[in-house]
């Protein structure tokens, strides 16, 4: 269905919040705000806090474009508030957001469904360190409830494992260790029911960390990704299945690896990905002729389709 900008009413672009990803979210939010206004949408920016529902109602906002990364905005809490308030919003619902935010439970779901994801161990005590070591070094140690590679460490020995566990636990999150995959890193951007062209990521760092994502100029993004069409299609299909398995919907991103034998491995899902000038979803959209204002327009129209059951 074709919509006019006036059909959406006033749209609140929620950004900021209180997570470790606040600054990135503010940059994403400003970009989304500019993109919506470029399409004539009556959009206002709101820095997300615990009084957000009252502020939305006071401002006459009829729907929300959510760009709050991390805890509070990406983990089901904001989604639950908006559901109770009856305010349509972009992206995944409560369940899909909560599951996808938790890297450990994400992998439990994929494992139960037979989807390929690297072997992993939850680190709750000293005894678990030995179980993690049995996976074989190198390992990735991750704070399970953080995004943007915050609280993520690559370790090569017992001392590094112990230190990384303690550092990640300081993020006030449960921590897991995961077998490190050697190979190429890809990301699949999800828009509606389709996976956009894959991007292959290349960084001189040990992995695609926070600096590589948002600050570095030496990260290389390959699109086309260099795979044969059938290989790329297979990874896109796997990404769509992994996304849906978590109850995620609307838009997002699936990160995966492909090892030296060509085996794919699912890593994680982002249900509110970055929308900065370094961000991957806008980059993938441009590859199929979707500019930034059109991208945010398409994401916003999903709120109408969900609201009216289209």
Labelled PLM ranges:
Residues 1-108, 112, 124-130, 302-310:
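ATP-binding N-terminal substructure of ATP-dependent carboxylate-amine bond-forming enzymes
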Residues 1-15, 43, 58, 99-184:
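Active-site nucleotide/adenylate-binding loops and adjacent lid/helix of ATP-dependent enzymes
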Residues 13, 190, 256-258:
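Conserved hydrophobic "DFG−1" position in protein kinase catalytic cores
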Residues 45-49, 175, 179, 249-261:
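A short glycine-rich, hydrophobically flanked beta-strand micro-motif that places a catalytic Asp/Glu
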Residues 77-83, 207-215, 271:
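Short, flexible, mixed-charge acidic loops at enzyme active sites
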Residues 109-114, 228-310:
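ATP-dependent carboxylate activation and anion-phosphoryl transfer catalytic cores
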Residues 156-237, 260-265:
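Phosphate-binding site of ATP-dependent enzymes
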């Amino acid at each position: 269905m074709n919509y006019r900008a006036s059909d959406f009413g006033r749209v609140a672009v929620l950004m900021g919040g209180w997570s470790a990803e606040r600054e990135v979210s503010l940059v994403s939010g400003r970009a989304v705000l500019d993109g919506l206004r470029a399409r004539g949408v009556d959009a206002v920016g709101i820095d997300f806090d615990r009084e957000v529902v009252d502020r939305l109602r006071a401002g006459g906002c009829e729907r929300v474009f959510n760009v709050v990364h991390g805890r509070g905005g990406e983990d089901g809490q904001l989604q639950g508030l908006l559901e109770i308030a009856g305010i349509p919003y972009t992206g995944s619902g409560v369940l899909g957001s909560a599951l996808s935010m938790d890297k450990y439970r994400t992998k439990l779901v994929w494992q139960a469904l037979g989807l390929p994801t690297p072997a992993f161990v939850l680190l709750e005590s000293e005894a678990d360190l030995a179980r993690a070591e049995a996976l074989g070094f190198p390992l990735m140690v991750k704070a399970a409830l953080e995004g943007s590679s915050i609280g993520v460490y690559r370790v090569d020995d017992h001392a590094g494992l112990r230190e990384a566990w303690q550092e990640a636990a300081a993020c006030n999150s449960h921590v897991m260790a995961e077998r490190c995959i050697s190979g190429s890193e890809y990301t699949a951007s999800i828009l509606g029911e389709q996976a956009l062209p894959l991007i292959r990521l290349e960084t001189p760092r040990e992995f695609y960390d926070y600096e590589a994502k948002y600050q570095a100029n030496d990260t290389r993004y390959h699109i086309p990704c260099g795979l044969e069409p059938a290989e790329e299609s297979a990874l896109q299909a796997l990404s769509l299945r992994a996304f849906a398995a978590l109850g995620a919907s609307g838009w997002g991103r699936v990160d995966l690896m492909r090892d030296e034998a060509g085996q794919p491995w699912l890593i994680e899902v982002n249900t509110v990905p970055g929308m900065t000038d370094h961000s991957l979803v806008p980059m993938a959209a441009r590859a199929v002729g979707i500019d930034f204002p059109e991208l945010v327009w398409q994401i916003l129209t999903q709120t109408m389709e969900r609201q009216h059951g289209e």
